[in-house]
Amino acid sequence: KGKCDWDDRWYASRKLDGVRCLAVVDENRVCTLYSRMGKELTTLNRVKEAIENTGIINHVFDGEICLLDENGNEDFQGVMKELRRKDHQIENPRFMIFDMIHKSEFNAGKGNTPLTERLRTLRAWQGGRFTCAKTLQYVDQVQINDDDHFETWNKLSAEKGWEGFMLRKNVGYEGKRSKNLVKVKKFHDAEYEVIDYDTDTAEVVRNGRSETIEMLSQVWIE
């Protein structure tokens, strides 16, 4: 609050409890799915086929892969477990999409097409006759009008038990961390003693190249 000029057109969307995914479609209509770290996701053929069946080419879809439990809530642990299984395909994945970028802008790492135009294109594509609406879902984006409207979203997020919500400014695509994409989340502070930790290797993309680095994977507290 206070950091955003609402006249610049900021859009809010619920922060989902899923796994970030980029679906890259080439000029031959072939779709490849990647994690945020650049690792290919091979358990999502249902999503891959659903995108390819629309006939879209040369676009990148940014969103999250979710599994819904019996109450309709995202099951983060469940989707992580399914994604890690070998020789397996997830039966009912939901690809919740919040951006659609032309591949030329994605490859350049920046673009001039504003968010509102990208969302308009995404909504039209998602509503097409060949789109499987159950597998490919559009994440609603709501323009925030003023500070009171922002506080309404803040309260809604807390009441619904959301992970938080995202704010996106109406600017062109930026393929890096940016002040034009803000995560709004309330934190509950507490102090714990770390009694042990573990590390693991992870594949990340830096300057267009894949690198394997050691990262903190988990901690034990008391």
Q: Which residue stretches match the model-derived regions?
A:
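Short beta-strand or tight-loop elements
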Residues: 6-8, 190-192, 217
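Short, basic, glycine/proline-bearing loop/turn elements
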Residues: 129-143
